[in-house]
Amino acid sequence: FPRNLFHTLDFTHEDLNKVNGSFKTGIAKEGWGKKGKAFIHNFPPPNVAYHFNAVMLQDYILSILKNKVKVVENNISSNELDANFIMDCSGKPKTLEKFDISSYIPVNSVHVTQCDWDYPRFQYTLTVARPYGWVFAIPLQDRCSVGYLYNKDINTLEDVKKDVNYIFDK
């Protein structure tokens, strides 16, 4: 993604400030596998990825490409458009009749919260196995975005919120 941003928009590492971004040098895993074993999957040098505020990145891209991009916010089929490139941001399929994968996915809900800070405390995506599911933490410049994925048919949101507080206290 950083290479694509650079080649299409001349987006540099310095532009990360404009989208509240931070460098991502790997993925840390805690509590997965053997008890007490944590590890970081580092990206080999010089590879790096980005964490960024998605809304700010969207605004940045649209401001750079305002005269080159037409945003269509409507329910249309791709054959109704004459375009070189189409990005479908509609999310899940309109009908889920043939798209039910719930029996394959053990989590079906997420609780997202933020913790404010004045600078990123780490340069990787943090993933932590927890009793009710798993947690991701994404560091941005002014905050850390934390999501707790769990199964709402087995656990309660209250239990998940208490466990998130335990993680913050750690």
Segments predicted by a language model, with ranges:
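Flavin (FAD/FMN) cofactor-binding core of flavoprotein oxidoreductases
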Residues: K24, D169-K170
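Mobile amphipathic helical/loop "lid" adjacent to a hydrophobic cofactor/ligand pocket
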Residues: A28-K68
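N-terminal FAD cofactor-binding segment of flavoenzymes
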Residues: F1-K37
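Short, charged/polar micro-motifs that form catalytic or ligand-binding hotspots
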Residues: N17-K24, N47-F52, I101, T127, ...
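Tryptophan-centered motif/residue detector
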Residues: H13-E14, W32-G33, Y50, W134, ...
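Predominantly flavin-linked oxidoreductase catalytic cores and closely associated redox partners
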Residues: D59-F168
